[in-house]
Amino acid sequence: MANLIRTDHQQHIPKKRKRGESRVFRLKTFGESGHPAEMNELSFRDNLAKLLEFGHFESSGLMGSWSFQLEIQRNPNPLYVLLFVVEEPIEASLNLRCNHCQYVGWGNQMICNKKYHFVIPSKETMAAFLKLEGGGYAFPEKESFSHLVELQGHVLHGFFHSNGFGHLLSLNGIETGSDLTGHQVMDLWDRLCTGLKARKIGLNDASHKKGMELRLLHGVAKGEPWFGRWGYRFGSGTYGVTQKIYEKALESVRNIPLCLLNHHLTSLNRETPILLSKYQSLSTEPLITLSDLFRFMLHLHSRLPRDNYMSNSRNQIISIDSTNCRWSQKRIQMAIKVVIESLKRVEYRWISRQEVRDAARNYIGDTGLLDFVLKSLGNQVVGNYLVRRSLNPVKKVLEYSLEDISNLLPSSNNELITLQNQNSMGKMATNGHNKITRGQVMKDMFYFYKHILMDYKGVLGPIGGILNQIGMASRAILDAKYFIKEYHYIRDTSAKTLHLDRGEELGIFCTIAWKCHHHNNEIKVPPQECIVVKKDATLSEVYGEAERVFRDIYWELRDVVVESVVGGQIEITRVDEMALNGNKGLVLEGNVGMMMNIEVTKCYEDDDKKKDKRIECECGATEEDGERMVCCDICEVWQHTRCVGVQHNEEVPRIFLCQSCDQHLIPLSFLP
């Protein structure tokens, strides 16, 4: 275990691996083909075995474990992290059934014999694991690797069942003190899933940043969660949210016109319209919808270097290139002053474009110049004023108003801003007075998130209309927590050939159909696996290899015996004859022994007891979704605590009556 803590001065190991010697692998390529293993097998279990050959073997016993040292950077200062792989047998699990599988949507999967945990500990979880003593790290006991997977707060923690289904449990980036960014950790996880040939991966998306839930922020901006960049899509929702509800909620929020939103917010909040105008002016493309706004802000935030600045147009001296404009700068500035004075005279009310134009024509006779200025002036800062322009959603006409923002601006010479716009807004030259930082963009993004997306919590008070609709849709988006990614490989043989030629061997895709006696002899068929046999193997040899593979993977098939081929192809006795027939996949018929059937039956009886629990919540949920529930003490129906008014930070009441039972109780007035 001395290799757990390594100094930065260790030399990189030679290409050839010596027995018992630790190796260093590049984080950036770890998991790709040949880095370190050629994971070119057709099954998850075989590729995993190849990968573990390159790991440093840490312990055996009940839970085997391996470690890999991954290099984050070599210069200027070498930086490493440790990746542990811990094998958890079914005997070490608290529950036979996997709750993660149930919540993400594949709870009917057969029970696997093993889980393989992939863990990159954080500094805190590593310290807890190694038990800091006297200023130095003590070597952990071999059996204590079970504690590693139980700790919370790892940089990365995901696990695979032995059939290739898996779950991502934890991912923490730089914000939590890690040396890795969230993107680096996620790239590594996705490479591992791809290289090992995982089947499906599920996750419970609780990712957040600066107080914002990323599945809502990225959902509105990009139409998918943060994990969508790696191919994760809706798996299942909580509180009765279905895929249709989720997609409808996303669509409704993303397509909200900013002009409509601005119109509603004008009378409620001064800051929001000003900020909207600020980012309209920063963008080279018009921001039409709420999706455009958040997408632009995310893009802008990613472009700005840390502690660096970008010019804000609020106090910019903007000019029009005289070669592209037929009016002089002097005439344009005069027209702007006239428009500003016209808006001042109506005491900052909203008036139509035509009214502004008519008032300005008393001083400016050139209607072409007025049209040009009005077109370019909308949502621009002029001196101490913000000229707001919005489409009236009722009258369907453009309206203008003036906002005094002198108290919001930093001290400056407050020069009159003229227009630089060939058609709408072109290149800008800054006087350097007002700068926008990466942190300011994040702060403004949180402001929009809080005051627009999350207003159902009453940030702006009890208001109705469009903001309430946005709040309800945002709640539905947040209640969609479980996302999945399905990895498609050649082993999914619904439309592919039976075998793959491997020289003297054949890779055969097959599965075993067996009767579950507890469920009225229901036929259960696990996903196909690739078994490798010689080209001239007999059917009995195929049966034997299939038994070995499926016994190793599934707890319910630990003593399965294959008896025949489904379909009754009795005349076929050799595998090469079967290959010549061009079958699409081999389905074998098997039986499970009596003792195993008793254990399986007991397991299913426990499942049935859980299924007998009546769940009838007002949100529409009819089964457990991982959220907290409470049971009525009279009708014994379970409901979400949130749906019955119990706040998240409140304890579940010891005695609880649902609304229906509470209304039907007869007052016992004769009791003292």
Swiss-Prot record:
UniProt KW keywords: Activator, Metal-binding, Nucleus, Transcription, Transcription regulation, Zinc, Zinc-finger
Molecular function via GO: zinc ion binding
Organism field: Arabidopsis thaliana (Mouse-ear cress)
Phenotype for residue 640 to N: Impaired fertility
Coiled coil: none
A Gene Ontology cellular-component term: nucleus
Effect of a null allele: No production of viable pollen. Degeneration of pollen occurs soon after microspore release from the tetrads, at which time the tapetum also appears abnormally vacuolated. Abnormal presence of ultrastructural features of apoptosis (PCD) in microspores, but lack of normal PCD in tapetum. Disturbed inflorescence branching and floral development. Impaired cell wall modifications after primexine formation within the callose wall, accompanied by reduced internal intine wall.
UniProt superkingdom: Eukaryota
Annotated compartments: Nucleus
GO biological process: anther wall tapetum morphogenesis; cellular response to brassinosteroid stimulus; microgametogenesis; pollen germination; pollen wall assembly; positive regulation of DNA-templated transcription; positive regulation of programmed cell death; reproductive process
Induction summary: Self down-regulation. Regulated by SDG2 via chromatin methylation. Seems inducible by brassinosteroids via BES1.
Documented effect of changing residue 627 to K: Normal fertility
PROSITE patterns: ZF_PHD_1 (PS01359)
Main localisation: nucleus
Protein name, per record: PHD finger protein MALE STERILITY 1
UniProt function note: Transcriptional activator required for anther and post-meiotic pollen development and maturation. Seems to regulate inflorescence branching and floral development. May control tapetal development by directly regulating tapetal programmed cell death (PCD) and breakdown. Implicated in pollen cytosolic components and wall development (e.g. exine and intine formation).
ZnF (PHD-type) intervals: 614-664
Entry comment describing in which tissues the protein is expressed: In closed flower buds, especially in anthers.
UniProt xrefs under InterPro entries: Zinc_finger_PHD-type_CS (IPR019786), Znf_FYVE_PHD (IPR011011), Znf_PHD (IPR001965), Znf_PHD-finger (IPR019787), Znf_RING/FYVE/PHD (IPR013083)
Pfam families recorded: PHD
